[in-house]
A protein has these predicted regions:
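ABC-type nucleotide-binding domain
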Residues: 1-215
């Protein structure tokens, strides 16, 4: 796992969107599997990357159809298995129409946390080799955070994982943590090393711990 952290507005989400191919770089290059992203068809990039953000868009269609967008050929059983793995199956089944519930424009009939879990289910169904999580637990309440973290762990087994996190406690075990400041890489290392060598990261960690203590 590679984690991107930094102050608000430092450029973390911009990096994630560049990696996902949403924008083109104006200098330098981004490679995926040894190939420059700018030379790859958008359809191929989309097949290789699952992008789960804090603002996941859902279409005004059924929950089943929204999850199935991850892999249009998936069976109903596969859709429901992905929902179970992401921790939203029980929630869906409590709805009057279950998986056939229409979510409303942009998923407006669901809470932010419910939309995120459906987006994670869609990513699980897609099973792409590269997973980008852009503050994917931003709307998850503390009671369900452990469940969603377990779902994310299942989603990312054997995959290249890039995480942008606002809760630093979720990325302390990352193989590499990249501290982004003012659009540049300020420092990068493990959690323990950054606590020793990077004042900015240390301040962010102390602020995070202080906020948790006040909850």
């Amino acid at each position: 796992m590679t984690a991107l952290v930094g102050p608000s507005g430092s450029g973390k989400s911009t990096v994630a969107k560049l990696i996902a191919g949403y924008w083109d770089v104006t200098s330098g290059s981004i490679t995926l599997g040894g190939h420059e992203l700018k030379d790859m068809p958008l359809s191929e990039i989309a097949d290789q990357i699952s992008y789960v953000s804090q603002d996941n868009y859902l279409f005004n269609r059924s929950i089943r159809e929204n999850i199935r967008m991850g892999r249009p050929s998936a069976t109903d059983a596969e859709v429901e298995q992905a929902a179970k793995q992401s921790g939203c199956d029980a929630i869906i089944r409590k709805l009057d129409n279950g998986y056939d519930t229409v979510v409303g424009s942009a998923g407006s009939h669901l809470s932010g946390g419910e939309r995120q879990r459906i987006a994670i289910a869609r990513a699980m169904l897609k099973n792409a080799p590269v997973v980008i999580l852009d503050e994917a637990t931003a709307y998850i309440d503390p009671e369900n955070e452990a469940l969603v973290q377990k779902a994310i762990s299942t989603l990312t087994v054997g995959k290249t994982l890039i995480v942008i996190a606002h809760r630093l406690s979720t990325i302390v075990g990352a193989d590499n943590i990249v501290v982004v400041k003012d659009g540049t890489i300020h420092a990068q290392s493990t959690h323990e090393k950054l606590l020793e060598t990077c004042p900015l990261y240390r301040d962010m960690w102390q602020a995070h711990i202080g906020a948790k203590d006040q909850m």
